[in-house]
Every structure is written in C-alpha cells, then in structure tokens.
Amino acid sequence: MLDLKRIRNNSNEIKEALNNRGEKFDVTVIDEVLKLDEERRNILVKVEVLKSKRNQVSSEVPKLKKEGKDVSNIVAEMKNLSEEIKGFDATLAKIDEKIQYIMLRIPNIPNPQVPDGETDEDNIEIRNWLEPTKFDFEPKAHWDIGTNLNILDFQRAGKVTGSRFTFYKGLGARLERAVISYFLDTHTEKHGYIEILPPYMVNRTSMIGTGQLPKFEEDAFKISEDDYFLIPTAEVPVTNLYRDEVLKGDELPLKHVAYSACFRSEAGSAGRDTRGLVRQHQFNKVELVKFTKPEQSYDELEKLTNDAETVLKELGIPYRVVRICKGDLGFTAALKYDLEVWMPSYNRYVEISSCSNFEDFQARRANIRYKEDSKAKPQYVHTLNGSGVAIGRTVAAILENYQNEDGSVTIPEVLRPYMGGKEAIK
C-alpha cells in the first residue's frame, strides 16, 4: 500500500508512474482518494473544534453547580455537541473505509531502476551463466523423460485429482526431496537464513498484507466456510509472521527461508506451459524472505538474488538473470529480477525464481515496523522475497539438461549425497 501522504504531495508523479505500468490502471482513483482525504481532514478539523468547545463547556459545570446555578442548558449543549461529534465519527468511519478500499487496489510504484517496457519481451538480460545445453541427439521433454523412467505419473494424478497435478514416484520422489533438502541446507548453512516451516493455510488479513488480496482472489484456493486460503507461496505466512509488530533495528536484516507446498488456480493461464511440471496447481517451493531497513533494501536484494543464483550454479543448470520492465512488474514489486533456467524442450529460458524488493508496500499493508531504539519513532521496514528456488521447475530443468541418449538422467553431483550416492536415474 502506498503512503497517502506521498500521494497527497506528489499526485502527478504517482499518476505518471501508474500510467507507465503495463496493466492499464485508472488513475482517476488518485483524484478520488485525494478528494476523500481532503474531506476527511476537513471533518477532523471540525471534530477538534467541537471537542474543544465541549471540553470548555464541560469545565464550567462544576463551578456553576457549586454556585447553585442551573446547568441544564449547558448539559443539553454538551449532549448536542457529543451527538454532533458522534455523527462526524460515523462519517469518518465510512470515508476511511472508502479510502482503504481504493488504497488496497493501487499497485506499487516502480523504482527508477526499472526499465521501460510493456511485456516480458522488453525485460533486460543482466547476466547469464553457462551456455544453453547442447545434445547430439533429439532431447525429450521432462514429462516424457519422467514418464518413461516411471518417476512421474501425470495420468494417474489426473484420475485422482485433475489436470496439472502429478505423482512423484520412486527416485522421482527422492529427487524432489533431495532438491528441497539441498536448497534448505545451502540457504541456512551457507547464506545465514533462519528456517521456517509455515502453515499452508492463512486468513484473509494475511493475504491482504502481502498483496494477493483483494486483486488476485480468483487465483487463490479458498476454504470458504472458514475464510482461509491455501498459500500461493510461503511469502504470505512468513511475511505475516511479523504483522502488527515493531521489530528492533539491530535485528535487521531478518532473513528467513521456508519450504512449503504452494497452491494456485492459475486462472487465465490455459495453454501456457500447462504440460509437465512448469505450471501446476500444487507445487513445492523454497522461499527467501527478508525484512530490512529502507537504506539496506537494495543491497539486500542483490544478495538475495545471488543466493538464489548459487543453487543453480552448483546444480550446473544454465540460467540467466533479467530485470523486469514496468509493464511486466506485477502489482506489489518496486523492482524485480527473474532467474530463468534453460529448458531444451522449450528451446528457451523459463522463469524459476522472482526476486523482488517491495520497499514499504507490504509493510504498510501488514503494519510491520521497526525502531532503532526505545525512544525512536517506529518506521516501516522494507520487505523482500525471492524463490530459492521453485522445486518442480528445478526437477524439470534437471531432467531436461541432464538427460542422456539412452533415456537415463545423470544426477547433479551436489544432489548425490541426498540420493544415497546414486549417479543416475535409469
């Protein structure tokens, strides 16, 4: 959520920034929220005048009573003032509700570093690692490799649940588990993150806090009778871990890593990478989340991105890093990098991680602040997160980039200790 004071003082700048985003945004709501804000502030002035008058009148009552004078007119005046204040308070509550409704639907403002552009074709490659994998045979898609090795079963998952689910079987299940353990061990032991195992369901307030609601409710799986939501990413519960709290400045940056299953309806994604493991309704992911001071956040974003890159380098999977343009930035991020791995069957790079700085956008929604010391005024933290990285897509990338002509798949060296020393899946 944006700072209302920032909108008030820089409305034209805010409108221009919102106009530059890819998704068409009705900037007239900025004028609407400013009108409501002005109305609210005018009423607050009136309320303060009335309260001052009520206090003044009230202070006269004891003296007049002591003198034996009739105070019924004064008491009646106090009652009228209180009723008038009560009416204004009710009006303020309605105005606050309208302002909140609008503010929750205004996207974040892109950082000046974000390049211009309208679609993912306008994203800018920052760096890459390893050349795309070459084969002297026709490479297979990961869903065919997994099916042929009897380690992935999409057909039976379709029978049991529906499309875009899978069973991992045998060494496929072990490979998934190995990747999860390797990622968690790397981020906790080498990169200094504190591990969290979060709930897989959250309440509506949590989804609002990280920006999934109200805009993206159709993409979420909802437990209607309880108003709970299955988490689309561990970012939601981990960020909300500190909702409505004031952290200590010397604790920052706080770094958490969390493995979780993730659940997404992927509404509107029909036909886009819907075969195999790339775009499933349920998938596993290791998430990196940071809480920082504002002046630290962009340095910490670079570190977080490098942490996510490390596991791809050690796995030996070709990848690149792209800076996301304004039109592809999404609702909550101020600046975002995507890590994309090479997928031979697609003959292109596929996103495996998004690393974002939200600045104070989520912190304002979730009311997460910090104080430098006990006497300091609380300030909003900056929140960051990134996949460290998506598990199913990592398995897909391993199957495709490490496939052999005989149909087997070589296991990356860093995963072999987690696979009982096995060197290949045959």
Curated annotation (Swiss-Prot):
The keyword S-adenosyl-L-methionine does not apply. This is Serine--tRNA ligase. Pfam families: Seryl_tRNA_N (PF02403), tRNA-synt_2b (PF00587). It is found in: Cytoplasm. The lineage of its organism: Bacteria, Bacillati, Bacillota, Clostridia, Eubacteriales. Belongs to the class-II aminoacyl-tRNA synthetase family. Type-1 seryl-tRNA synthetase subfamily. HAMAP family: Ser_tRNA_synth_type1. Its EC number is 6.1.1.11. Consists of two distinct domains, a catalytic core and a N-terminal extension that is involved in tRNA binding. It catalyses: tRNA(Ser) + L-serine + ATP = L-seryl-tRNA(Ser) + AMP + diphosphate + H(+); tRNA(Sec) + L-serine + ATP = L-seryl-tRNA(Sec) + AMP + diphosphate + H(+). InterPro entries: aa-tRNA-synt_IIb (IPR002314), aa-tRNA-synth_II (IPR006195), aa-tRNA-synth_II/BPL/LPL (IPR045864), Ser-tRNA-ligase_type_1 (IPR002317), Ser-tRNA-synth_1_N (IPR015866), SerRS_1_N_sf (IPR042103), SerRS_core (IPR033729), tRNA-bd_arm (IPR010978).
